[in-house]
Amino acid sequence: MSELPELTPDLESGEEGFLIKPEFKPKAIRSFVIRAGRITVGQKNAFDTWWPVFGLGLFKGMINPEQVFGRKAPLVLEIGFGMGDSLLEMARNEPDKNFIGIEVHPPGVGRLINVAGQENLTNLRVYMADAMDVLEDCIPDGAIDRLQLY
C-alpha cells in the first residue's frame, strides 16, 4: 500500500498526541479546509498498524483497482467520509463491492482504518489527500461504479 504519513509530536499544546497532515499537491485553491490535524496516541497506533494495509498514497500515481483489492468488483468511491461510520457500514454490508474513501481529517482516517483492521475488512482502502488530486492522478477513467460525495 502506501508509506505511513509523517507524524510529528504535538509539542505546542502540552498534551500527549501527534500532528499529521494529508497529502496534496501545491496549488492555490483546495477542495477542502484543513481541520485540526492532531491525533491521539491511539490514533497514531492505528496509523502505525493499519496504514500500510489500508492506506493509498497520492504520489504513488494511477492505481489498478483489481491489483489494489486482489479482485475485480464494483468500485464505490466516497469523498469526505468524516469519522467513517457510513463507509464502514457499507463495507461491512456490501462485501461484494470494493470501497475507496477520501478524507483529509486525520482523526477520521485513523478511526476508519483502526476499525477496518480490527474487523478484517478486505474491501476498503483510503486516501488521506485532496479529492481533486486523487481523482486526477490516481483513479483511472471509468473505474468508479458509484461516487458518493459528502
Feature roles, as predicted:
Residues 136-146:
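A short acidic, Gly/Pro-enriched loop at the edge of an enzyme's catalytic core
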Residues 149:
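Redox-cofactor binding/interface segments in oxidoreductases and associated redox assembly factors
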